[in-house]
């Protein structure tokens, strides 16, 4: 797992799931909202801004995120693959020092919630948000009608502060999860690393193989991948949970006595 700059020290992070959220409203909640797929450099700028502001004010830093990704519900045919599973995102949030995460189940019904109702029902009634950290191009709510201008106008009426964070760019374009997906899929891993701010990470579960590598004196670990975005077939230098010994990874098709399988 690539190293990230964290909000030091790492605290215990509470995780809330479902529409109900926290039973008791958090103290002086400083909130940021997003999917945060990949938890890349631009995401970390938002998340760390929430952590630091909450600590300065003696409040609670909270990330509101969604599962599944809204794109899977709104346009399942064209939905983009995920850079990392939810549990990996939560691990990154914990390293960054967030006090809490609220995972909202994104459904077709939830997608019909207006931007104004999201502010009133989620941010104010449930969280009693005092400050909301957002990117300059942040949009939300049904038909993406909520933007920075609407947020500011509504927040002014509700007594909530909106803190816009300047867009982070690399190579003349905004850093985004979609750019990183494209880089990994095309094998441009050095560029993906620059956008992520850390080494690209793949997630999988070791599964039994045929044992031919072990019989040849070169034991291998076969992975059933949990990552949806994979690099092209090839041989890559890898690290496994920061082990010091060098590793190599083959991504491709493995010949089998009765056919082939992807590895």
Q: Residues of each region from the PLM?
A:
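A glycine-rich helix N-cap at a beta->alpha junction
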Residues: 85-101
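N-terminal catalytic cores of NTP/NDP-binding nucleotidyl/phosphoryl-transfer enzymes
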Residues: 22-85
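Glycine-rich, highly charged phosphate/nucleotide-binding loops
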Residues: 81-89, 113-119
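Phosphate/ribose-recognition catalytic cores of enzymes acting on nucleotide-derived substrates
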Residues: 209-263
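Classical nucleotidyltransferase
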Residues: 109-219
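Positively charged, low-complexity intrinsically disordered leader regions
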Residues: 2-30
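Residue-level signal for inorganic ion chemistry
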Residues: 40, 93, 132, 192, ...
